[in-house]
Amino acid sequence: MIELRDVTFTYRQADPTPASEAPGVRGIDLTVSDGRCVLVCGASGCGKTTITRLANGLAPAFFPGELSGQVLIDGEDCAGLESWQVAERVGSVFQNPRTQFFNVDSTGEVAFTLESMGWPEEKIRERTDATISELGLSTLADRSIFSLSGGQRQRIAYASAWAAHPRNLVLDEPTGNLDLESIRALRGYLLDAKRKGAAILVTEHRLWWLLDVVDEVVVMAGGGIAQRLAPVEFAALDSCGLAGLGLRTTDIREVRATSPRGTGSSPEPFLQARGLRARYGRQEVLHGVDLEVRSGETVALTGGNGAGKSTLARVLCGLHRASAGTIRMRGGAAFVKDRNRASAIVFQHVGHQLFANSVQAEVTLGLPKARVPSAEHTQEILDCLGLAQLAGRHPATLSGGQKQRLAIAACIASGKSLLILDEPTSGLDLVGMRAVAGLVRELAAAGHALLVITHDAEFVAACCQRVIRLAEGRVATDIPVYEDDLVWNLMTASREPTSRG
């Protein structure tokens, strides 16, 4: 059981002045009983991640700040427990799983929790093998962590958290990089954990998969609890009711395309790839990919975790060498340096590409003087993405969704012709997703070519004109998006339609 009793927490940065205090949460009363699941949702920056850090003991132990009230785990006050004692009681999956890994191989990572708890070696092997089998991860066993996709890493992180069968689970946006099949699998894992008596606290923006999992929905705003909903009340909310709370859809199968196919895209491709192959070490990841993206067009690149989407993106922008095939831009051969100059990319985990000391400085960091946007244009970009009020903040103090928007802002400010966005809406709330979709539409209208790697049907519906699905390193389908299409069907299609109704 996890209990927060009248908890208020404010982060304190290294600078001890009052102005350095970052927002946290206030007056939180929350109980997650054994065998129950509580969903905490709300806008980016509302305090969801802080709730998870309090529940698993990371705040204030590793995230310093001022704490009042009580946090209890299985009836014991966290203030009187050592960090290892909390870790034995609570299994955690972080927003970015890379920040919780201690091993370089997947099987070792699953076993790590058991080793830390001092289990006998034979029992560790038995439970590790059983967990990998139980969660259907045999194809990911004994793999280098660095060779795994973002979604595959999240699945390994959950396996590590669940290996010891903890009485409590805390998951911070666990589906951020998961494909649709893996999300459905995670739903099954959580239902099983509930049946086994685990108390589960989960924060999410993508809500559709949780409808029959949660026992209570807590909506947060401005660091406090704004509303509590029973599952039946939550399920009864229509799109307007959800939007009023800043929440995303609960019925992904009914999401329809709202962005009509544009007529402003160029008839000739800006980017053309033929027969692309790429390797990681001895393993071939791409097996002869053919792809085109036109100026003025936004293409969604979808597919299962490990299908090769991120590798393809890195090859196209010159960050990873193809082992075979050709890439052309504007009809001419495009070598690595040409692709570097013409493209900008937002990575799956944006924390690896934020370097400046302020949000404002990050937007123009590294740009040559001739290409630095005016102060007015920079302000417009920040305004559009809801970051203007955070211009003076250090990027490290931002929430996951705010960091995502900042990386997108820097990508836009670069003015490059080809923009590649890898999971740009992971960690984004409804408002943030719509803001990014609006900017993508504007960029396409201005003549940019955009390739968006995504599992987000709402985002595809709002701004994409084509859906390309990769499967096992090959293009499985390439389907145009027409207004009012059911996007779920396009993203999961096993073959291309022969006609349009």
Protein language model regions, located:
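The feature captures the beta-strand-to-loop junction immediately N-terminal to the Walker
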Residues: 41-43, 302-304
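Conserved ABC ATPase "signature" region
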Residues: 122-140, 373-390
